[in-house]
Amino acid sequence: MSLPIRNVAIIAHVDHGKTTLVDALLKQSGIFREGEDVPVCVMDSNDLERERGITILSKNTAVRYQDTLINIVDTPGHADFGGEVERVLGMVDGCVLIVDANEGPMPQTRFVLKKALEKGLRPLVVVNKIDRPRADPNTAVDKVFDLFVELGADDDQCDFTTLFASGLGGFAKESLDDDSEDMKPLFEAILHHVPPPAGDPNKPLQLQVTTLDYSDYLGRIIIGRIHNGTVKAGQQAALVKEDGSIAKGKVSKLLGFEGLNRIELPEASAGYIVAIAGFADANIGETLTCPDEPQALPLIKVDEPTLQMTFSVNDSPFAGQEGKFVTSRQIRDRLNRELETNVALRVEDGESAEQFLVSGRGELHLGILIETMRREGYEFQVAQPQVIYREVNGQPCEPVEYLVLDVPEAAVGACIERLGQRRGEMQDMQTSVNGRTQLEFVIPARGLLGFRGDFIRITRGEGIMNHSFLEYRPMSGDLETRYNGVMVAFEEGVATFYAMKNAEDRGVFFITPGTKVYKGMIIGEHNRPQDIELNVCKTKQLTNHRSATGDELVQLQAPEDMNLERALEYIGPDELVEITPESIRLRKVARKKLVKR
């Protein structure tokens, strides 16, 4: 007899409405009290997730529908967090693929769908945001089918069920002509199209650790699906480690999921997704099993990192003024702690005791780690991101990205020209009736470093850019990613309006008057290829004579906002980003002789 359980993952491209759709399922399942204030994107609990509107960490929740427990896992949509996606797909028996009715499949759709198909899952396709202007659900379905075929889906997978929905509107329907006003069709589709979990509750216990959590009261908590057997609170169990060794322990707490809460369970059997406390040394991919006859499950395979960055102790003239954790030991401990839960991350010792080589899946993956550490009070500096090269069949190869741009027609020529300079190869171009053009490129990952700033300028902020890792290909030769030099502060002090106004014609500033600067700090972009030193601390010589015209109202051009993401992609090989809880500064590594003004 099959268990009254369904384990399903929600997968999609970033910003196609996964979390909003899960919100609607939660609200309509009755888990919230009447009148309870429920925030938007209730599944995004992390501050960074709410600010950026993206899911970074996978989340588990469960709802009851017609006496069936539906475990729902909301996964990240960005390939940089693929380590999360790959792990959670091993916990489920089916998935819901969400596609925007206007945009159709995008680069990250390709990534998450490829992972699901490789796992043998049969996706249930939901075309979301059908109530938006410019929505074209039928075209979106055609593009999804083409993508299934392109990714090598078998006949059963290509024969997918399609629903049309609006997560914000809170409804789903089997056809566009239906008048459904709730999510019942989606609940029914999950029950009928997602198979019940396999597994034998009478076999020895096998649970694979897919996620780690931490509680001040319980310590480390392991989360995973029971593949076989039964687990009871208080029982003895064995943890099969990565190296094959066995660590025995006791299940001190057994928790299940209900809505957004965890509830205590006396026992759970094959098919359940549970959280267990009592195993302080557990790591992701290891197997919790029976101590009498331990049987390990295959370790989880995660794609290797494609980008690396050197983290080091801040040694700028302003070092130690704003951070709480500033030493190499504190930075090392924090990075090692991140390794416990961030399965796609790698940390190695650098060239000195104060440097660490951190590898990840992309700029966003490493950028989120840096921003998280910054908010926790850490102060450090990072060097220019570098792609990780590999040798394939004796030939040096580099990571290549699949890039999709949605731009105004007027910007098409400039985008194609700039990507050509970065060794991008155009694969397709489609123009829509609304005056926008979609461009598809294959481009080396290093060709994308620093491109986002150019792209924003070329499209005047009206372009949309998405990309994901495609494969490793033979090296495509040298390329230049930045065409302008930088303006560097000549001395330590406070930037003045007078000095900045006089130097305004030299380029674009990253700072405002009143900003503290030091010798070697990058304060702007020069409008010529070479770097230049500027004295932005110079003050106006006051006299007892008034100007004939009086002091006119003079304004400076607005500075370029150099946030963390922009700073990481902007810096060159001889530059660093200085990161503190209060500031993000750019600086030169070793000061060379520059053109002086």
Swiss-Prot record:
**KW Aminoacyl-tRNA synthetase (keyword) present:** no
**Short name of one Pfam family:** GTP_EFTU
EC top class named in words: hydrolase
List UniProt keywords, sorted A-Z. Cytoplasm, GTP-binding, Hydrolase, Nucleotide-binding, Ribosome biogenesis, RNA-binding, rRNA-binding, tRNA-binding
Q: Name one GO molecular function term.
A: GTP binding
Subcellular localization, per the record?
Cytoplasm
Principal localisation: cytoplasm
GO cellular component terms, alphabetically, are:
cytoplasm
Q: Which reaction does it catalyse?
A: GTP + H2O = GDP + phosphate + H(+)
Q: Does the keyword rRNA-binding apply?
A: yes
SUPFAM superfamilies xref list = EF-G C-terminal domain-like, P-loop containing nucleoside triphosphate hydrolases, Translation proteins
Identify the residues that the record assigns to the tr-type G domain, covering every copy: 3-198
Q: Name one GO biological process term.
A: ribosomal large subunit assembly
Q: Which InterPro entries match?
A: BipA (IPR006298), BipA_C (IPR048876), BipA_GTP-bd_dom (IPR047041), BipA_II (IPR047042), BipA_III (IPR047043), BipA_V (IPR035651), EFG_II (IPR041095), EFG_III/V (IPR035647)
Gene3D superfamilies, alphabetically?
Answer: 3.30.70.240, bipa protein (2.40.50.250), Elongation Factor G (Translational Gtpase), domain 3 (3.30.70.870), P-loop containing nucleotide triphosphate hydrolases (3.40.50.300), Translation factors (2.40.30.10)
Residues engaged in binding GTP: 15-20, 128-131
- Give the EC number: 3.6.5.-
Looking up NCBIfam families in the UniProt record yields: small_GTP, TypA_BipA
Subunit record text:
Monomer.
Q: What does this protein do?
A: A 50S ribosomal subunit assembly protein with GTPase activity, required for 50S subunit assembly at low temperatures, may also play a role in translation. Binds GTP and analogs. Binds the 70S ribosome between the 30S and 50S subunits, in a similar position as ribosome-bound EF-G; it contacts a number of ribosomal proteins, both rRNAs and the A-site tRNA.
Which family, according to UniProt? Belongs to the TRAFAC class translation factor GTPase superfamily. Classic translation factor GTPase family. BipA subfamily.
Q: What is this protein called?
A: Large ribosomal subunit assembly factor BipA
Source species: Synechocystis sp. (strain ATCC 27184 / PCC 6803 / Kazusa)
